[in-house]
Amino acid sequence: MSQLLEKAKDFVVDKVANIKKPEASVSDVDLKHVSRECVEYGAKVSVSNPYSHSIPICEISYNFRSAGRGIASGTIPDPGSLKASDTTMLDVPVKVPYNILVSLVKDIGADWDIDYELELGLTIDLPIVGNFTIPLSQKGEIKLPTLSDIF
């Protein structure tokens, strides 16, 4: 009897491990909006859904770092669903207050940009498997807004 249960367990584990899962990538991080309080950047995330039905996204969590310091983090609850058998583009807004940017003066230096690392966690609700988080990471540099961008 225990051999039968062990075989059944191995079968289920093998099938669950080989289930197709959505794949995601960060395609771009750009300046989105400048206000008097903060600079808002937008991360464009491309997510492909291999299933023939839409899948709900539970949440998107993000951590925006520069010079080894966290400069913005947050969670976007219930951002929508992934389209069935298609690629969905998600826009993740990241708001960075000016006082944080001022503290990064050494990194900004002469080239007027921020070297960043963006870590995203895209949590989706897969049938049978349950909540599944796709970890994403993107490194790059973003130009800071000039006075002409603000006014």
Swiss-Prot record:
Record's keyword terms, sorted: Stress response
Induction comment: By water stress; in leaves.
Keyword Lipid metabolism included in the entry's annotation: no
The keyword DNA repair appears for this protein: no
Homology family: Belongs to the LEA type 2 family.
PANTHER family reported in the protein's UniProt record: DESICCATION-RELATED PROTEIN LEA14-RELATED, PTHR31459
Protein name according to UniProt: Late embryogenesis abundant protein Lea14-A
Source organism of this protein record: Gossypium hirsutum
Phylogenetic lineage: Eukaryota, Viridiplantae, Streptophyta, Embryophyta, Tracheophyta
